[in-house]
């Protein structure tokens, strides 16, 4: 390829990938599959490596993470990043309104209200449309240069739609679903978990290695324009519209209000809606919308007079810790869980809360009988925040983690660089039981009627010890179990038999190979197509697949380099369990008669087995149309986890709703 052709192709790929990033991370309306995005990205990386003279700082390829830094350089903000004054109740808001009106001689004032994202405040500097520097807020005057880490956040444009010089400010955050996934991975690996999404975002942004930040799935909302050359902005709402036109991601839930009563109504509305968002908010920001009035009101040394932050009441309650229970996960990690006197937190009754590991119990000096403060991290996971030491009577009991596994009495170990205690006995009954529960779960073999209770019964009756044992179960054995009759036993035997026909990716995920989630299992299944081919794959062959890292590749090779595993696979073959990939690839979907042909579909929430971009591509290949909002013309809503407000819209317009399982069934017909 000539240099001229290479340069042209590099420019084409950059434009294409920038468009894909904008559609996915800003508009939330992806137009291509993950696989197609990855192919284009790998082609760009290869061409840039072969033609380094064409490398650019605003290339989409820099989002994968660059060189490890030694330190973060200090940055002085051109204008201070001021904090906001706080309001904690309706009276505080009315006082703010009174002060504003007094300051502008009771001129009519319009407010703009925005959700207060609970993340990390940052500034973004652009020169002639190119992202040149990003910094933390720091103390408001001096922050830290985190440019390379911010480049990994795909919601931040590396090049704007206009060649304008400006400084934008916003909040980098971690979505709740990403927070839960990250902590699950850290717990499985025996690492310290993050207390909440804000800490996770801040910890990710301040990594000296940008590649770590790149893996954390951060996002960002821009909320303000600090400096802009050669453009007159008359209102804050106008500045947000302008930022959106430039390619920034702004929060869609803002509202202009003509009176303080409308502001209070907005605050009350979002206090109710808050749990349904996929990101944390800790309040509402209220600003005078008119820029001229802002300038007239001015600022104090610490904060602007024209803005205030209403802080939501803390979602924290006090209850008594009555005991500590231990559980052994399928990877052997021993996790302590607090048993609590039942208490309502964020709308649900909480009886248990994770204590994560022994170090946390010691650090917080948690004892049995203590009164503790409990909250939901990310409005999702109950956790013990701290002990109320003033309530201690002296009768509380110190807790010490055991030295041996509570399930099998094997000695517990703490692996290198792990904080968790782990049972490494491969015959530990608790690990086997948890592994069986995972094997039959929805995203794995999806055996209807075979949940945790039934697995426990089968295990305690000594009917099953391995995954393959499930396929030797008889109706007569099931009839010996509590709550099983003729019909339920027959149905379960049939469901187990039907699971033999599952596609390879479900079996792979069900095996519980360390570090291999549902998405990676699908990637392996599509790539190798048969279990035999995957078993023979080398670490180098696995690492050559997009998004498969060294740790996962090593884990897969180690797993299949085990005689017990190979014997298990042989048993699967003898029982007739399918071990080939049955899913359709996008290229195979053209001209197939499909339910989706001519239908308008909305995807919402997190899809576990395939990404929304891949789902969109497959629907379109089958003749359907995917849109970003629900209306009367919508035929179907496919709802994953944390689906949010689109479910309510579907109900309002009487639109059919499918879960991911139903969607996959139709897709694979």
UniProtKB/Swiss-Prot annotation:
Catalytic residue positions: 116 (n6-amp-lysine intermediate)
Domain BRCT: 591-669
GO cellular component entries: cytosol
GO annotation terms (biological process): DNA repair; DNA replication
Family annotation (NCBIfam families): dnlj, PRK07956.1
Family of the protein in this entry: Belongs to the NAD-dependent DNA ligase family. LigA subfamily.
Name under which the protein is recorded: DNA ligase
Name of the gene encoding the protein in the UniProt record: ligA
